[in-house]
Design a protein with these regions (language model features):
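Structural detector for tandem alpha-solenoid helical repeats, activating at a conserved register
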Residues: 43, 62, 77, 92-93
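Amphipathic alpha-helical scaffolding segments comprising HEAT/armadillo-like alpha-solenoid repeats
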Residues: 2-13, 40-53, 76-86, 107-109
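Solvent-exposed, amphipathic alpha-helical segments
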Residues: 8-19, 30-33
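Alpha-helical interaction scaffolds
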Residues: 14-15, 78, 89-108
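HEAT-repeat alpha-solenoid elements in large eukaryotic scaffold proteins
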Residues: 18-29, 44, 53-57
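Alpha-solenoid helical repeat architecture
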Residues: 17, 52-56, 71, 86, ...
Length: 109
């Protein structure tokens, strides 16, 4: 199987829509592909946060938590892009991430 470029995976994530039946497995597969085959960097953040903006109430049956855990497992400074995303459209998981980030920052001081 040919490994795809990061921008191809991100484009598919950006265009993802769950099936009419509410099947999110396609996004789950895309996120797995992104985390396992590429070096996630700052360029990925806007696309990943746009998923939260498009689905602000997280109806993904837990799939979008993969974005939360994946980003939090990196050493990326994601606070600014997260705040920008929340300014465009507040989202449940975006707010959770910001709260967790602020809590972690406060405890690290």
């Amino acid at each position: 199987m040919k490994m795809r470029l990061q921008n191809e995976i991100l484009s598919d994530i950006d265009q993802f829509e769950p099936s009419p039946e509410g099947d999110w497995r396609g996004l789950d597969a895309l996120l797995t592909e992104l985390w396992q085959t590429t070096k996630v960097n700052e360029a990925c953040l806007p696309v990943l946060f746009r998923v939260f903006e498009r689905f602000p109430d997280d109806s993904s049956a837990g799939v979008c938590w993969g974005i939360v855990h994946g980003i939090e497992s990196t050493d990326l400074d994601y606070e600014k892009p997260l705040r920008e995303s929340l300014a465009r459209r507040s989202s449940e998981l975006g707010q959770i991430m910001l709260h967790r980030l602020e809590k972690w920052t406060a405890s690290a001081q």
